[in-house]
Amino acid sequence: MKVSIVGITGYSGLELVKILNNHKKVELVSIHATKEVGRRLSDVYPYLAGVCDLKIEDFDAQEIIEKADLVFFATPSGVASSLAEEFVQADFPIIDLSGDHRLPADVYQEWYKKSPAKKMILNKFTYALSEYTDVKGKKFIANPGCYATATELALIPLVAAGLIETDSIIVDAKSGLTGAGKALSESSHFVNVHDNYMTYKLNHHQHIPEIVQTLQAFDADMPEIQFSTSLLPVNRGIMATVYCKLKKDVAVSDIASAFAKAYDDKPFVRVQENLPELHNVIGSNFTDIGFAYNEKTNVMTVISVIDNLLKGASGQAVQNLNLMQGWDETEGLHMTPSYL
């Protein structure tokens, strides 16, 4: 299968290159960006020498349609919403890593403060959390966000089984700096990040409606959640710490059973007896989940950790590609966590 990447110079685009280089069924045939056009990717990023020596090209939908069988959009929000339309009209498969096709138009505009894609385009896309969405044969995939992935995988088994008081959910999520993308900003300046810890977009992060929308598919009465996001002084990784109260007569063994039922046959979710750590998933497509119960307060704490650039972006995108095509779900994704 031949694929193209739009948004090649961003963190997620570069991670896609590394993954696809090890994918037995995929050939990367073109790469596109607005920067460094005409230069070989390996000249811009020498660590990719011998991995990807393709030249970066301007975006040209027709050229991609002629060359490839599928396109990945690894672009900032607000880009794919306009560029994807030509592909949809041509019935040409898309996996969009941005948030442009995850939400209804009015919700997207409210939370992203940008013009949404047309409703007829949005209706074509399937929101694809790999462990829960049947995407075989689908053509248009909205890849979940990084915070959303970690949080949803932690909560869906408990919400679906009716084990927790959904109005008690509090999520304290923390991300490495790559989650903010490459755009220059005061908050990502080295002197503001190094040896620091800061909360941002409190109650206003754009992944909040995505998470609630997904959970409501498992409990129609699911209310809004309290959700905070903070920046960690690390390059990559997300830790979502979820607090919730158990319903009456629910035992800790019921929680363990719910996670086992949900994930025992899922190759990229590891439910652990110990509490997860970022180092154990960095460089991989794994999600590690652990939990602990406080009998005095009736509060269950669930911790979910992922690599924000892999399971939270490019890794899950390739996982979805594999599922779309009916291939082995793990193809191209046999990355051992780097740990250090």
From Swiss-Prot:
It comes from the Bacteria. InterPro entries: AGPR_AS, AGPR_type-1, NAD(P)-bd_dom_sf, NAGSA_dehydrogenase, Semialdehyde_DH_NAD-bd. Transmembrane segments: none annotated. Signal peptide: none annotated. It catalyses: N-acetyl-L-glutamate 5-semialdehyde + phosphate + NADP(+) = N-acetyl-L-glutamyl 5-phosphate + NADPH + H(+). PROSITE patterns: ARGC. One of its GO terms (cellular component) is cytoplasm. Keywords: Amino-acid biosynthesis, Arginine biosynthesis, Cytoplasm, NADP, Oxidoreductase. Its EC number is 1.2.1.38. Gene3D superfamilies: Dihydrodipicolinate Reductase, domain 2 (3.30.360.10), NAD(P)-binding Rossmann-like Domain (3.40.50.720). GO terms for biological process: L-arginine biosynthetic process. The active site is at 146. Pathway: Amino-acid biosynthesis; L-arginine biosynthesis; N(2)-acetyl-L-ornithine from L-glutamate: step 3/4. The keyword Ligase does not apply. GO terms for molecular function: N-acetyl-gamma-glutamyl-phosphate reductase activity; NAD binding; NADP+ binding. It is found in: Cytoplasm. Catalyzes the NADPH-dependent reduction of N-acetyl-5-glutamyl phosphate to yield N-acetyl-L-glutamate 5-semialdehyde. HAMAP family: ArgC_type1 (MF_00150). Belongs to the NAGSA dehydrogenase family. Type 1 subfamily. PANTHER family: N-ACETYL-GAMMA-GLUTAMYL-PHOSPHATE REDUCTASE, CHLOROPLASTIC-RELATED, N-ACETYL-GAMMA-GLUTAMYL-PHOSPHATE REDUCTASE, CHLOROPLASTIC-RELATED-RELATED. This is N-acetyl-gamma-glutamyl-phosphate reductase. It comes from Streptococcus thermophilus (strain ATCC BAA-250 / LMG 18311).
